[in-house]
Amino acid sequence: MHTIEEKAAAFVRLLQIMDELREKCPWDKKQTFESLRPNTIEETFELADALLKGNKKEISKELGDVLLHVIFYAKIGS
């Protein structure tokens, strides 16, 4: 198990990567709340399917995808 410090450092690194992508990646730069919405809906349905199946590995993966979208929306809004 990773320490809280390691988990915090990993989360900070994720935020840094998202900052860099938003600044430098052409696709990321042009995304809006509206353009990202269909992808978010798809990820949410994938999470729902994993939950219904009780597949912990898939649930974890899909939660990561949804979290990434939450962070992306926060970056768009900032």
What are these regions (language model features)?
Residues 1-59:
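Extended low-complexity intrinsically disordered regions
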Residues 60-63, 67-78:
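Hydrophobic/aromatic-rich structural module bridging two neighboring secondary-structure elements via a short loop
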